[in-house]
């Protein structure tokens, strides 16, 4: 029986109409495609993908809170997303579910407590200062490459605390980019797999995945032979022991978690910082206030600075790196007027709820002050999901915020920027990446 007849399913696209009409927007820009559909159907709509897969896309706050927090035990990561992304990046925390996810989360969580992370702060600050000392200046500078390289070097050094050869870093970066591009095209074009018999694209990408894992395995092997103790995330993963057995993770499990940390740990921060600079470049008052903060406070105190945090939050509100997330219902469920069967995939569209007039005043305007109370202290906002929500809240959120605070403090102490008038183009991959960010950059120091 058609689920639309038995349940209360939001209006949306059938398989045929999805392919013929909606899909052309997804191929160009997933965020714009979903936004256009929200304008047509409202805050929640549905789509039936090939294979009779029912997907509900929502930017309704109560719906998002229900699936991610209030009734989270009824939801796992969707098989569709795990098959597509997990096939490339492994079964780490970002893609696993159920008892295995909980086991891994409990095992790894202690390594991300604030006191543990503070031991990595000096690594982050050293990398930030070195990068900004050589930061490109001039007219219409594309700031994405140096910031992406910085974020990548920070996560690699935090993971491994060794200087990897430049060629290895470049190879890892190229592999990640190619793997992401492949996965997103696969998800946005449901019939694309039919072309593989002619193109062998899937086999090419599997070879990329295998090469990536081989590089990680070599690094782990070298570390096991090294008698020194390192204050890095790899040592934490190698030394972690399961409570019930006292056993360590296997190399494959460690590689899964390393790949997830690399994927989430550099893409999200690099993207957010680039979006942030592109917005602040058009707001001289915000830039001046950041300069004053940077010149009158210590960089290590920036983590607790309310204004710096507010600027970062506002950037993540307007351009959330994690612009949506998925869950699959394990049993029939419903929210408000909607009811849907088990195996329904729910896509929580953070980008949309972050710009909803129901929750934000002047939602399309860059206003960091909205995150401050009357006393200038940082406040929490209910319709704000920069790192997800519920038990699966990003495990590295504190590390990411610290890294971004250090960068913002150091950047505006050293540099000033202005807009070129060219808006960055959104490039939604696994994260929301800017295609290019062209700014006029001048050095203060």
Regions found by a protein language model. Give the residues of each.
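Cytochrome P450 proximal C-terminal region
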Residues: 7, 38, 128, 174-178, ...
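Conserved cytochrome P450 K-helix/beta-meander segment immediately N-terminal to the heme-binding cysteine loop
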Residues: 348-375
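Conserved cytochrome P450 catalytic core segment spanning the I/J/K helices
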Residues: 22, 45, 86, 113-115, ...
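Cytochrome P450 catalytic-core helices
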Residues: 266-293, 398-413
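Cytochrome P450 catalytic-domain helical core, especially the substrate-recognition surface
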Residues: 2-39, 53, 61-65, 70-72, ...
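Conserved cytochrome P450 K-helix E-x-x-R motif and the immediately C-terminal K′/meander segment
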Residues: 21-42, 214, 218, 299-336, ...
């Amino acid at each position: 029986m058609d689920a639309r007849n038995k349940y209360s399913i939001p209006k949306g696209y059938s398989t045929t109409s999805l392919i013929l009409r909606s899909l052309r927007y997804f191929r160009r820009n997933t965020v714009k495609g979903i936004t256009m559909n929200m304008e047509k159907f409202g805050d929640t709509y549905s789509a039936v993908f090939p294979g009779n897969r029912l997907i509900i896309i929502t930017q309704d706050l109560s719906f998002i809170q229900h699936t991610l927090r209030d009734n989270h035990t009824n939801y796992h990561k969707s098989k569709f997303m795990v098959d597509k992304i997990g096939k490339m990046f492994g079964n780490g925390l970002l893609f696993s579910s159920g008892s295995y996810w909980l086991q891994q989360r409990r095992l790894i969580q202690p390594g991300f407590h604030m006191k543990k992370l503070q031991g990595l702060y000096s690594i982050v600050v050293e990398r930030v200062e070195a990068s900004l000392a050589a930061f490109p200046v001039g007219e219409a500078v594309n700031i994405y490459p140096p910031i992406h390289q910085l974020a990548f070097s920070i996560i690699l050094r935090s993971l491994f605390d060794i200087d990897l050869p430049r060629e290895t870093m470049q190879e890892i970066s190229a592999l990640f980019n190619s793997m992401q591009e492949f996965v997103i095209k696969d998800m946005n074009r449901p019939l694309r797999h039919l072309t593989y018999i002619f193109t062998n694209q899937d086999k090419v990408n599997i070879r990329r995945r295998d090469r990536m894992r081989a590089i990680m395995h070599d690094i782990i092997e070298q570390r096991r032979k090294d008698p020194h103790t390192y204050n890095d995330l790899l040592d934490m993963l190698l030394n972690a022991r399961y409570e019930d057995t006292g056993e360590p993770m296997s190399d494959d499990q460690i590689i899964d978690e390393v790949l997830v940390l690399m994927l989430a740990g550099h893409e999200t921060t690099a993207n957010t910082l680039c979006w942030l600079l592109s917005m602040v470049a058009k707001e001289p008052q915000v830039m001046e206030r950041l300069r004053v903060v940077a010149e009158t406070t210590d960089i290590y105190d920036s983590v607790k600075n309310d204004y710096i945090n507010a600027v970062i939050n506002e950037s993540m509100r307007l351009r959330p790196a994690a612009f949506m997330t998925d869950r699959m219902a394990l049993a029939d469920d419903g929210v408000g007027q909607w009811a849907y069967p088990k195996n329904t995939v729910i896509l929580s569209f953070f980008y949309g709820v972050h710009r909803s007039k129901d929750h934000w005043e002047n939602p399309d305007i860059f206003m960091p002050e909205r995150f401050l109370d009357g006393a200038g202290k940082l406040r929490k906002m209910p319709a704000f999901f920069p790192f997800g929500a519920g038990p699966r809240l990003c495990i590295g959120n504190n590390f990411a915020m610290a890294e971004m605070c250090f960068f913002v403090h150091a950047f505006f102490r050293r540099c000033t920027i202005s807009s070129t008038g060219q808006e960055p183009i959104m490039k939604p991959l696994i994260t929301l990446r800017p295609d290019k960010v062209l700014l006029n950059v001048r050095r203060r120091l």
